[in-house]
């Protein structure tokens, strides 16, 4: 007999009935018992649930993740994992199925981050059409990033209550609908407001990716999965101006940057509706309990998670945890600062590159192509993942399955040094009126900028996740809020900075700031264990 997990009329997956019961007892047996009498039904259901309860110690030994509880193990109606090999548990899924989920959240991340930068291609056109200054039309980029930051706070805890799929699907749907509003906007302030909500609902892939990957992969597996995922949210902003500049210089006009983003979002919505399974373990158990209640007509079947659902409390707790970690935890403070600096540099570049390469007589489409170097660097950094994984695996094996969070920091040694080098390289080789310095020279530096960009991001994320574990979602939400809110504000100063300071010193200023970030990975590599030992919240090895 096949068991279909249903929620709101959608089929989430199918497993055989022996995933529900052991000892030869299944739902059909329960149904037959109901026909024979109440006593028989209770007997059958007890036998079925005892089979669930007896495997819990083994689940604990094997490291299968579930919520701890003070619930009495004699609670026969408490739904748990059936065994350590329960195919409903996402950690037991085949690797191909896990990667299908990773690809889908990567596509969502690409679509929403594409939307963060594609608008910058149309800022000049928006300014002319609505009769406002460049600074006012640039608010569309600013408020998107601010909305992106604030959206990270509620959606991470909501995904822990209602499941990952519901949050991904609903927020992407809202993001796509607000693209339609952007394409139809008749004045600048309508457009600015719509851009904020585009960012707000587009924040979920970056705020929830840590939870989704933790649902599916062990920490050592996450070593190669997270960099693979991270290439997409960084390639999105790179392709934004590349495609957007060609759209805006064509007969289509700036409105089509929103229509293109809407089409991309609609395609991904269809894909995830049909192919994305639920990965949150507690939510899957909720579906299992719901099925048993419907099938046996016994309302006593329940999960711990169902009893603890309180959206308001969860959001409040997540917000307070995020603020607390951001104020009191040196690891969160320093790596949030590092990520913020890197993002500020990246989004200022979206304003600065058009100014620099316009002096080389590039047209709008060619200016967009100047971002390809950053994209190449991001892809090359992702290609280094097998080397990094081999290193981590050796450490993991040598230490009998124990890894320190500080072991994650090695790639950042390279990234932290290469970041300022790439900035100074770009700053002092962009001579558009010098016959002996070709435009390709500063563009080559952007490859190393993209490389360091990805290293900083995925190493920081892995280090925070390993350091805070259960509170990692709150720590990452705090980092997301700060870096996007700060990037949004600083994106307004990018164009004036390049105009007033000039190409060389504007980029050099960013380089000097990145020099100040170099000590962070080295200091935490040396003192990280001691800092975690003094923390109330960090994981202590």
Curated annotation (Swiss-Prot):
InterPro entries listed in its UniProt record: MFS, MFS_dom, MFS_trans_sf
Keyword field: Membrane, Transmembrane, Transmembrane helix, Transport
Alphabetical GO biological process terms: transmembrane transport
Transmembrane segments: 99-119, 131-153, 165-185, 187-207, 224-244, 256-276, 325-345, 367-387, 409-429, 439-459, 472-494, 508-528
Subcellular localization(s) per the UniProt record: Membrane
Gene Ontology cellular component terms for the protein in this record: plasma membrane
Keyword Transmembrane: yes
Pfam families: MFS_1
SUPFAM superfamilies named among the record's database cross-references: MFS general substrate transporter
Entry keyword Transmembrane: yes
Membrane disposition: Multi-pass membrane protein
Top-level lineage group: Eukaryota
Any one Gene Ontology molecular-function term assigned to this protein's record: transmembrane transporter activity
Protein family (similarity comment): Belongs to the major facilitator superfamily. CAR1 family.
Name of the protein described by the UniProt record: Uncharacterized transporter C530.02
Protein species of origin: Schizosaccharomyces pombe (strain 972 / ATCC 24843)
Lineage, opening ranks: Eukaryota, Fungi, Dikarya, Ascomycota, Taphrinomycotina
């Amino acid at each position: 007999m096949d068991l279909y997990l249903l929620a709101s009329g959608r089929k989430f997956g199918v497993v055989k009935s022996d995933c529900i019961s052991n000892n030869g007892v299944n739902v059909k047996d329960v149904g037959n018992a109901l026909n024979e009498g109440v006593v028989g039904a209770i007997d059958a259901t007890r036998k079925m649930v005892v089979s669930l309860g007896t495997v819990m110690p083994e689940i604990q030994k094997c490291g299968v993740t579930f919520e701890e509880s003070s619930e009495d193990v004699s609670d026969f109606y408490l739904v748990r994992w059936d065994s350590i090999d329960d195919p409903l548990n996402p950690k037991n899924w085949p690797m191909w199925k896990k990667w299908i989920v990773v690809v889908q959240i990567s596509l969502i991340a690409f679509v929403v981050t594409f939307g963060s930068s594609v608008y910058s291609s149309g800022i000049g056109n928006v300014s002319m059409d609505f009769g406002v200054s460049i600074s006012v039309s640039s608010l569309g980029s600013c408020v998107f990033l601010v909305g992106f930051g604030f959206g990270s706070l509620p959606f991470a805890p909501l995904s822990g209550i209602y499941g990952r799929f519901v949050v991904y699907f609903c927020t992407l749907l809202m993001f796509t609908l607000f693209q339609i509003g952007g394409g139809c906007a008749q004045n600048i302030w309508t457009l600015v407001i719509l851009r904020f909500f585009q960012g707000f609902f587009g924040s979920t892939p970056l705020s929830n990716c840590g939870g989704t990957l933790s649902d599916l992969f062990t920490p050592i597996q996450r070593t190669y999965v997270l960099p693979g995922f991270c290439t997409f949210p960084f390639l999105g902003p790179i392709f934004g101006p590349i495609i957007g500049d060609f759209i805006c210089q064509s007969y289509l006009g700036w409105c089509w940057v929103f229509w293109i983003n809407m089409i991309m979002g609609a395609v991904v919505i269809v894909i995830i509706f049909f192919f994305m399974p639920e990965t949150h373990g507690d939510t899957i158990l909720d579906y299992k309990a719901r099925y048993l209640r419907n099938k046996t007509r016994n309302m006593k079947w329940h999960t711990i998670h169902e009893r603890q659902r309180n959206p308001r409390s969860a959001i409040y707790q997540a917000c307070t945890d995020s603020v607390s970690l951001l104020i009191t935890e040196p690891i969160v403070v320093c790596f949030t600062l590092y990520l913020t600096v890197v993002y500020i540099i990246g989004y200022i570049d979206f304003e600065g590159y058009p100014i620099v390469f316009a002096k080389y007589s590039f047209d709008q489409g060619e200016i967009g192509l100047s971002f390809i170097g950053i994209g190449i660097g991001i892809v090359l950094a992702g290609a280094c993942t097998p080397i990094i994984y081999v290193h981590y695996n050796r450490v993991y094996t040598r230490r009998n399955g124990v890894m320190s969070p500080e072991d994650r920091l090695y790639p950042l040694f390279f990234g932290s040094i290469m970041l300022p080098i790439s900035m100074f390289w770009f700053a002092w080789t962009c001579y558009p009126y010098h016959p002996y310095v070709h435009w390709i020279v500063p563009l080559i530096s952007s490859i190393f900028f993209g490389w360091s960009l990805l290293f900083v991001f995925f190493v920081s994320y892995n280090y925070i996740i390993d350091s805070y574990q259960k509170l990692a979602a709150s720590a990452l939400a705090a980092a997301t809020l700060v870096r996007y809110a700060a990037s949004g504000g600083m994106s307004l100063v990018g164009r004036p900075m390049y105009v007033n300071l000039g190409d060389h010193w504007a980029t050099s200023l960013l380089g000097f700031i990145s020099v100040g970030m170099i000590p962070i990975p080295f200091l935490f590599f040396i003192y990280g264990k001691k800092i975690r030992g003094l923390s109330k919240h960090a994981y202590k090895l």
